[in-house]
Curated annotation (Swiss-Prot):
Gene, per the UniProt record: gltX2
Protein name: Glutamate--tRNA ligase 2
Reactions catalysed, as given in the entry: tRNA(Glu) + L-glutamate + ATP = L-glutamyl-tRNA(Glu) + AMP + diphosphate
GO function term, MF aspect, one: ATP binding
UniProt GO BP: glutamyl-tRNA aminoacylation
PANTHER family noted in UniProt: GLUTAMATE--TRNA LIGASE, GLUTAMATE--TRNA LIGASE, MITOCHONDRIAL-RELATED
Cited Pfam families: Anticodon_2, tRNA-synt_1c
Enzyme kind, highest EC tier: ligase
Length: 463
């Protein structure tokens, strides 16, 4: 295969969408698999909607996922002179023309076609007019002169050959009246100028492909290989939207997902390698090919995503888990070295109850001795309705323990339960609520051993 060059070309109008992240991943893996280049282009020609914040979100999202691009980032907003020269070249070669038709007239024709239940294709009266007839008081657009006869074939590696009759393609605008390029022209000029060999993108771009190929043909450029992948859908099979949950990569980071886990999950959304579920980035680069892409839309499954993330969490060592957990906690708490040591000691038992870093951080709050406990509503109700005399017995019993380890603590609770004719859980339920603020947590006996007698008694005495 020739030197492979792929590109990821997002519009900076919001966050880095989870579907866009998958597109970037596929382009990255394909380029790396073939020892090629993965380029980044920011399609910011829409000045009203493009923002610096969105550009930064794209950069940070890609870096967090580990999708490092090659070379300098291309900004379309800085390349309009290149697009203008390209449009004028087609004009000089008779492959484009000035059009003076107003938007109002085009809209009138569209409405007429709609009323007659006809498919609307704008046919400009200026297509073959002599320049001597041009009005001098109207700024024209430049339109592509699409051949009236024949057809365009999209040779898609996934969808197969898609044939579009030229009669169904309008003479699209290349250069607006204000001299700025349209998306269609800019994309083709950039892909050619950047040497793009393979275009991998969502199948929502399939309708654009025929129009872009018409521009490629007009310039005499070689058309890159095209692969249009099905979009990601929600669990209900509908197109992914806000009601399905988080859409931006940054949101998944904030929810405590690991980048390695998210890449693995996105990779399996529409691509497979036998029955392999756990695929490292190294393996993905080695195995990735376009032949294994699926033709049907993939459904976002948070249960599977959580399960996969839990697996990747368990691959991290104790120090790394502690560091990542403390980093999250520091967003809201001032953490002492003593508290860090508690969390590190407790990490194995926290990990078995967690699927995300956020789960870990929530449980790790138990060990923040310098911060007030956050009580769940159910825990509050348990505390309010518990036997206060029983808790006093617990305080007295624990205070008598000399070697405050989990075995001694457990034996003391059993002793108190037997003395009162209770089951062990009858005591542990309110004690857990008081010590952790939760109704479900790691072993209270282990928590007691890690925090020590003084901290445990302090929490029990608030009642």
């Amino acid at each position: 295969m020739t030197n492979v060059i792929t590109r990821f070309a997002p519009s900076p109008t919001g966050f880095l969408h989870i579907g866009s992240a998958r597109t970037a991943l596929f382009n990255y893996l394909f380029a790396r698999h073939h020892n090629g280049k993965f380029l980044l282009r920011i399609e910011d020609t829409d000045k009203e909607r493009s923002t610096k914040e969105a550009v930064e979100a794209i950069f940070s999202g890609l870096k967090w996922l580990g999708l490092d691009w090659d070379g300098e980032v291309i900004f379309q907003s800085k390349r309009n002179n290149l697009y203008k020269e390209a449009a004028l070249r087609l004009l000089q070669e008779g492959k484009a023309y000035y059009c003076f038709t107003s938007q109002e007239e085009i809209e009138r024709q569209r409405q007429k076609a709609l009323e007659n239940k006809q498919h609307f294709i704008f046919n400009s009266e200026w297509r073959d007019k002599d320049s001597s007839t041009y009005p001098t008081d109207i700024k024209p657009v430049i339109r592509l002169k699409v051949p009236r006869e024949g057809s365009i074939t999209i040779h898609d590696t996934l969808q197969g050959d898609v044939v579009i009759e030229n009669s169904h393609i309008d003479d699209m605008v290349l250069l607006r009246a204000d001299g700025t390029a349209t998306y269609m022209l800019a994309v083709v000029v950039d892909d050619h100028d950047m040497g793009i060999t393979h275009i991998i993108r969502g199948d929502d771009h399939l309708t654009n492909a025929a129009r872009q190929i018409a521009i490629y043909h007009a310039f005499g450029y070689e058309v890159p290989s095209m692969t249009h992948i099905p979009l990601i859908h929600g669990a209900d099979g509908a197109k992914l939207s806000k009601r399905h949950g988080a859409l931006g990569v940054e949101a998944y980071k904030d929810m405590g997902y690991l980048p390695e886990s998210l890449c693995n999950y996105l990779l399996r959304l529409g691509w497979s390698h036998g029955d392999d579920e756990i695929i490292s980035m190294t393996q993905a680069i080695e195995w990735f090919n376009l032949d294994s892409l699926g033709k049907s839309p993939s459904k976002l499954d948070f249960a599977k995503m959580n399960s996969l993330n839990a697996h990747y969490l368990r691959m991290l060592d104790n120090d790394s888990l502690t560091s990542k957990t403390v980093e999250i906690l520091k967003q809201n708490y001032k953490i002492s070295e003593k508290e860090v040591s508690y969390i590190k000691q407790a990490m194995p038992s926290l990990l078995v109850r967690s699927e995300t870093l956020l789960d870990l951080a929530k449980l790790a709050r138990i060990y923040l001795i310098n911060s007030p406990i956050i009580y769940e509503q159910e825990a509050k109700e348990i505390i309010e309705n518990c036997d206060k005399d029983l808790i006093k017995q617990v305080i007295e019993g624990l205070n008598k323990i000399e070697q405050f380890d989990k075995e001694s603590v457990q034996n003391k609770f059993k002793e108190i339960a037997t003395h009162n004719g209770l089951k062990l859980n009858d005591i542990m339920k309110p004690v857990r609520a008081l010590i952790t603020g939760m109704t479900a947590s790691p072993s209270v006996f282990e928590i007691a051993e890690i925090l020590g007698k003084e901290n445990i008694l302090k929490r029990l005495k608030i009642i």
